[in-house]
């Protein structure tokens, strides 16, 4: 199992410039065939918002977006079942300790609670994950 943040998934639509990041995004995409990816409920809004920004900037078309979303629908991406309300105090504490947004701390909390690596390109979130004792997808053991 992996916790997937929006930045990693969006790299499948908006390719990264760094070769190592491109390879990591491709590895995560390949793992969708046999590995479960877990997301918090906020993931869908974050992905939709980034897609809209990309469309408005002319980086992607609505038809490219539709194809991307159809592929995501086929992927083994599960939404965390617990209510965000149950985790709010932990998310706030993690956000305060690591100077994260509540959104990013939501991913961190989920990865720590599930003991799963966090797949992210957000360097601040990745560092907070390591500091909190979690694992980041792509890090060597």
Regions picked out by a protein language model, each given a short descriptive name:
Residues 1-42, 54-66, 132:
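Short, well-structured N-terminal submotif of metal-dependent ribonuclease cores
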């Amino acid at each position: 199992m992996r916790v997937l943040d929006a930045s990693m998934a969006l790299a499948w639509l908006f390719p990264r410039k760094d070769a190592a990041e491109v390879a990591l995004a491709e590895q995560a995409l390949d793992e969708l065939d046999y590995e479960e990816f877990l997301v918090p409920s906020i993931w869908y809004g974050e992905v939709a918002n980034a897609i809209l920004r990309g469309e408005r900037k002319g980086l992607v078309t609505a038809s490219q977006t539709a194809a991307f979303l159809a592929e995501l629908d086929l992927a083994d991406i599960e939404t965390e079942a617990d209510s965000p309300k149950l985790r709010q105090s932990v998310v706030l504490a993690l956000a305060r300790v690591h100077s994260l947004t509540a959104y990013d701390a939501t991913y961190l909390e989920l990865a720590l609670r599930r003991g799963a690596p966090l797949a992210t390109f957000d360097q601040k979130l990745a560092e907070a994950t390591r500091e909190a004792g979690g694992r980041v997808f792509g890090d060597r053991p």
